[in-house]
Amino acid sequence: MAGGAIVASGGASRSSEYQGGLTAYVLLVALVAACGGMLLGYDNGVTGGVASMEQFERKFFPDVYEKKQQIVETSPYCTYDNPKLQLFVSSLFLAGLISCIFSAWITRNWGRKASMGIGGIFFIAAGGLVNAFAQDIAMLIVGRVLLGFGVGLGSQVVPQYLSEVAPFSHRGMLNIGYQLFVTIGILIAGLVNYGVRNWDNGWRLSLGLAAVPGLILLLGAIVLPESPNFLVEKGRTDQGRRILEKLRGTSHVEAEFADIVAAVEIARPITMRQSWRSLFTRRYMPQLLTSFVIQFFQQFTGINAIIFYVPVLFSSLGSASSAALLNTVVVGAVNVGSTMIAVLLSDKFGRRFLLIEGGITCCLAMLAAGITLGVEFGQYGTEDLPHPVSAGVLAVICIFIAGFAWSWGPMGWLIPSEIFTLETRPAGTAVAVMGNFLFSFVIGQAFVSMLCAMKFGVFLFFAGWLVIMVLCAIFLLPETKGVPIERVQALYARHWFWKKVMGPAAQEIIAEDEKRVAASQAIMKEERISQTMK
């Protein structure tokens, strides 16, 4: 929602006018909403582990099983190069991409709570019913598609909701709660896969338990308050004010509420169709490009290639199935711990610093992994990796995961949720999530084929992209730490590069921002006079 310090013309800081802080109530609201991240996390974590279980492979992917048992001779790099297996992994993201088109309309017209509830229902139906009882690949893919609809809705609305309910000084911390629960979902999935690895049809339980995070999101949608921004936008101003006061723990919310009202007055005349069209004008192009490119960069760190395929990767390198699944648990634990670091650091050091530092860490780790595999495993991998080398590869992957988890992971969700204006926010966040799912689909569909074709070079490929990401973060990304989201567009209008992209609209935005500040101050003055008279 609103929040933070940005210096307006004349040098006046707005942050001192925002009252209230981090209350127990807003913490509880953010905690329940952030649980929606477990939908995406559990699915990401469970997929690769299930794909490495022999019972699952024999039933759905016998070609892969024969390669693993060396019934069919092949390079270890190519063991899992199977189009149907890749479709099983990536089909969810194609469905999620499509669902984002509808989720923006639902979020703007029915509210944030409705989007969360519908997403939870899709996840319960798909995880609890279709995938758990799948009899063939077709049924498995149908379940994945339904899961994709649920993940698409949850991923679009939860970060947006968290940004709208969070106080300015803790927006980064609370929004990263979504990514934290993504990592918790990944860890839980790894533990479940490891626990049922020797059970008959244990893979059914692994897939079926996806219904649990869906149920949590559905229940959360019932008990959570609606976003004050949405209520004001729908004309329920008094209710929006009451919820804002409860979230902030004070009745003195004049400045923040005035900013919301001013933003709504600009957004209200704009229809959903106009919102989508506006995104592609020069006025909003900087935010659109930022959010979309961040999603591209997030996936081309190689993160989902690692998360999806950690068990598969270590199986390919010679680890037994149980050891490969245990490695997944280790990676998941590192992921959770490092994301907790991001929760503490994002509002202290800012978004750009974490992206730059994390990008450098990930790049060095990818280089180390590629060089180690190139030297020890070679192009053909005729022998299993020695245990010390395998442990070294695991350590390097954990360093990569740590660097990603406090940078490109949480920032990939936080930044798009806080840079769009109210009138374009549902459509803008939908485009960001669509980009995430599009590139997740590409990586999920292509990684094992890339591993087969490029061998250890696939890690060097991702390292090259990480260099580009760091440079873009240094030169092209404005720092949004402490900036009220109603005023981020003015930040872009003053940026050395993005003001050129905006063209004449940049000066219009700056003038509108100054006018909005003046209007907010006038409303505050009237309310103070009114309270004094009472």
Swiss-Prot record:
Cellular compartment(s): Membrane
Key words of the record: Membrane, Sugar transport, Symport, Transmembrane, Transmembrane helix, Transport
GO molecular function: monosaccharide transmembrane transporter activity; symporter activity
Protein name: H(+)/hexose cotransporter 3
Matches recorded under PANTHER family: IP12678P, SOLUTE CARRIER FAMILY 2, FACILITATED GLUCOSE TRANSPORTER
Main location group: membrane
Superkingdom of the source species: Eukaryota
Topological type in the membrane: Multi-pass membrane protein
Function: Active uptake of hexoses.
Recorded family membership: Belongs to the major facilitator superfamily. Sugar transporter (TC 2.A.1.1) family.
Membrane-crossing segments per the record: 21-41, 87-107, 114-135, 138-158, 174-194, 205-225, 300-322, 329-349, 353-373, 395-415, 434-454, 457-477
InterPro entries for this protein: MFS_dom, MFS_STP/MST-like_plant, MFS_sugar_transport-like, MFS_trans_sf, STP/PLT_plant, Sugar/inositol_transpt, Sugar_transporter_CS
GO cellular component term, pick one: membrane
Extracellular topology ranges: 42-86, 136-137, 195-204, 323-328, 374-394, 455-456
PROSITE patterns according to UniProt: MFS, SUGAR_TRANSPORT_1, SUGAR_TRANSPORT_2
Keyword Ubl conjugation: no
Residue intervals annotated with topology Cytoplasmic: 1-20, 108-113, 159-173, 226-299, 350-352, 416-433, 478-534
Keyword Transmembrane helix attached: yes
Gene behind this protein: HUP3
